C-alpha cells in the first residue's frame, strides 16, 4: 500500500494512478481537519480535486484502530447520493477509486467552513439552513434499492464510543479536560443501572437495524457552508441503518451547541418520512 501523508511530494502524488493523460499535479494542501482520513486538496493543470486515503487507524487519534476499508463504504454511499436528484448537489461526486491503496478522488466542492464554531457560540444555524439539512436527511433516508457494503466494523467502532465507553465508571477519559466539573457530573449516569439497560437496548438496535440509508455521523463537522450553499460530507460511518439515529445525533449536537430550543420541533415537523419520535429522543439522549 502507498502511504500518503500531508508531506508527500508532488512527484509521488503525480505517480498515483489517478490522473488523466497529460494532467500535471501543481499543488497539494491539507483540506480540513480530517478526523478519520487523510484529506488533501490537489490542484492540477486541469482541475482542483480532493484526495482521501484511509488508514488502519483514526487519523486524529492514531492509537484507535479503525477499519481501513471504510472508504469503500463511503464511495458506495456517495454514488447512491449522486444518483438521487434531490440530494445529489449536497455531496461530492466520486471521480476515481483505487481499492488497492484505499485512495479516493472526489469532486472539490470549493473552499468553505464547517459548523464546528457553533459549540463555542460563534455561529448560529439559521432556520433556512436547518430546513435544508432536514431535507438532506429526508432525501438520503428515502433512497431505496441500493447496495452498500456491510459496515459492521465501522458500526461497531461507533457503537463502542457512543453506547459503551461513555457509560463505564472507569473509561479512561477525564471529562474535566473538556469542562471542569463534568467528571463528577458523569457519575450519576455511569452508576445508573436503569439507564445502562436502556442504552444497551438502544445500542443493540443501532447495530442491527438496516431499514434506511443513513449518513451515520450527522454533526456540525460534516456540514459545510460553501458560499451560499450547504454541503454534507464524510458519510464513512453510514450505510443501511436506523433513520432515527441520524435525527437523534442531529438534535443532540444542536443541544450541545445551545441552538434555539424550538429547532427540535422544527426538525421533526419538516422530516416527512415515518419515524418513531421515542427512538429519536432516545438517540438524542
How does the language model describe each region?
Residues 29-44, 49-51, 197-245:
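Active-site acidic catalytic loop and adjacent metal/ATP-binding pocket
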Residues 58, 113-114, 223, 240-242, ...:
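Conserved protein kinase catalytic core
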Residues 10-14, 76-82, 198-199, 268-271:
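Short, well-ordered amphipathic alpha-helices
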Residues 76, 244-275, 285:
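Active-site activation/catalytic loop segments of kinase-like enzymes and analogous catalytic loops
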Residues 1-27:
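Juxta-kinase regulatory segment immediately upstream of eukaryotic protein kinase catalytic domains
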Residues 67, 122-123, 231, 248-250:
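Glycine-rich, phosphate-binding/catalytic loops in enzymes
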Residues 1-5, 152-202:
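Active-site catalytic-loop/activation-segment of kinase and kinase-like phosphoryl-transfer enzymes
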Residues 31, 41-152:
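ATP-binding pocket architecture of kinase catalytic cores
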